[in-house]
């Protein structure tokens, strides 16, 4: 299995007649962070529960560091989970919460105290040992939950939507802390979220799931730039989809032609295709050819940019423009496309 540390082979999971995971194959390299991303009900949390040993697969095998753990209990998998709900004991001090797993393993008091101290220092909570859960903030509670997992030094660390209960600013700081610690400690990690920004921020690779299947696995930048289906294109950020034509690297939309230098990376034959345009790929200018002309339908000020809906060739085209490049007085403009943010899909999609 080479450097593959966590491997799922031909995994199927059914509940009654309902198949929620359909012949899934997945491998994670030692020391990497991979995120399962997808809409509600796609199967991502079920995969995490299968890895943890909280569910058993109907078919297939699970390996950790080369060992078949398919039938092993959660206690025998050397795995820790950071939950969305934190799952802290309110009647225990922070130190006792973090050291609870060590105590259950029979680790002596002196060693336990030292390891708890080190774990709290890792999550920037040095000196919090004697406080209680109701004396700290939600963000601090999540860091306590993270310290409780790290103190056990697991082979695999699982994250089950750990930031869902935090506000936007805390989510940002916590995902940075999680990524920093995961890289510093080199812990193989599997992360579950429905939040694209979160997935992009913490991951070496992102796996997008839908209806119990893996749709695409790649680094975040590649997923966004080269989606392999309409589902991926719509799920990984906003885009406008147009009918187009590809001929030797030149793309035609509404009689407007432009060269796409990396067209070969989409592995399409010349001919009809679908062209996806991200909002940031569009520049609205005051001059252009007739086939570039669009009509401004609406514009909403979002703070650092304008979110604009235009009509181009009879279809809506979403545009994000900076305040310097757009005025509310504009009724018409001309579409200029940049190569970054334009992608191609098979017409059959």
From Swiss-Prot:
Domain of life: Bacteria
Transmembrane segments: none
Entry's Gene Ontology cellular component terms: ATP-binding cassette (ABC) transporter complex
Key word Phosphoprotein present: no
Gene3D superfamilies referenced in this protein's UniProt entry, alphabetically: 2.40.50.100, P-loop containing nucleotide triphosphate hydrolases
Main location class: membrane
Catalytic reaction list: Fe(3+)(out) + ATP + H2O = Fe(3+)(in) + ADP + phosphate + H(+)
Signal peptide: none
Membrane topology: Peripheral membrane protein
SUPFAM superfamilies given in the database record: MOP-like (SSF50331), P-loop containing nucleoside triphosphate hydrolases (SSF52540)
Entry's EC annotation: 7.2.2.7
Keyword terms: ATP-binding, Cell inner membrane, Cell membrane, Ion transport, Iron, Iron transport, Membrane, Nucleotide-binding, Translocase, Transport
Assembly and binders: The complex is composed of two ATP-binding proteins (FbpC), two transmembrane proteins (FbpB) and a solute-binding protein (FbpA).
Job of this protein: Part of the ABC transporter complex FbpABC involved in Fe(3+) ions import. Responsible for energy coupling to the transport system.
Similarity-based family: Belongs to the ABC transporter superfamily. Fe(3+) ion importer (TC 3.A.1.10) family.
Protein name: Fe(3+) ions import ATP-binding protein FbpC
Organism of this sequence: Histophilus somni (strain 129Pt)
């Amino acid at each position: 299995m080479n450097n593959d540390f966590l491997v799922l082979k031909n995994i199927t999971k059914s509940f009654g007649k309902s198949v929620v995971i359909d012949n899934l194959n997945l491998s994670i390299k030692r020391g990497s962070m991979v995120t399962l991303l997808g809409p509600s009900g796609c199967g991502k949390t079920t995969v995490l529960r299968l890895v943890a040993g909280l569910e058993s697969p109907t078919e297939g095998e699970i390996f950790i560091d080369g060992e078949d753990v398919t039938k092993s209990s959660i206690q025998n998998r050397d795995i820790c989970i950071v939950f969305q709900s934190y799952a802290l004991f309110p009647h225990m001090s922070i130190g006792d919460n973090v050291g609870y797993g060590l105590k259950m393993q029979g680790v002596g008091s002196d060693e336990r105290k030292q390891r708890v101290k080190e774990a709290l220092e890792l999550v920037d909570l040095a000196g919090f040992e004697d406080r209680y859960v109701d004396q700290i903030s939600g963000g601090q509670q999540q860091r306590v939950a993270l310290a409780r997992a790290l103190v056990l030094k697991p082979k695999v660390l699982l994250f089950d939507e750990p930031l869902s209960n935090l506000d936007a600013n805390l989510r940002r700081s916590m995902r940075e802390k999680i990524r920093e610690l995961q890289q510093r400690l080199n812990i193989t990690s599997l992360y579950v979220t429905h939040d694209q920004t979160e997935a992009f921020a913490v991951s070496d690779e992102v796996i997008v799931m839908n209806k119990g299947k893996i749709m695409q696995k790649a680094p975040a930048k590649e997923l966004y730039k080269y989606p392999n289906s309409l589902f991926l294109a719509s799920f990984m950020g906003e885009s406008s989809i147009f009918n187009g034509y590809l001929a030797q690297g030149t793309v035609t939309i509404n009689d407007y032609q432009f060269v796409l230098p990396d067209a070969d990376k989409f592995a399409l034959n010349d001919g009809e295709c679908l062209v996806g345009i991200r909002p940031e790929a569009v520049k609205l200018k005051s001059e252009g050819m007739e086939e570039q002309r669009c009509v401004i339908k609406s514009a909403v000020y979002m703070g650092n940019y304008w979110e604009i809906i235009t009509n181009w060739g009879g279809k809506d085209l979403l545009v994000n423009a900076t305040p310097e490049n757009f005025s509310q007085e504009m009724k018409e403009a001309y579409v200029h496309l940049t190569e970054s943010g334009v992608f191609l899909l098979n017409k059959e999609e």
